[in-house]
């Protein structure tokens, strides 16, 4: 019997993918950060590892909805710089 693979939704494109194919972004109450190991505490959101989903997330401020709060512009800018190392 095959092991269950968790499915998560990308906040950029809305597609559903296996959890290990997506990048987790965490909000700990004060800042957003990339959680490449899926071990950090805080509310998480998932994003495809491609430039289009990243750009859509930033342009439409999708993290505000995912984290149910207002994310500051400097957090989006910081995330944009960090994400460039992970996107294809």
Predicted feature locations:
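Short, flexible, mixed-charge glycine/proline-rich loop motifs
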Residues: 1-6, 37-41
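Short functional micro-motifs and their immediate structural scaffolds
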Residues: 18, 53, 58
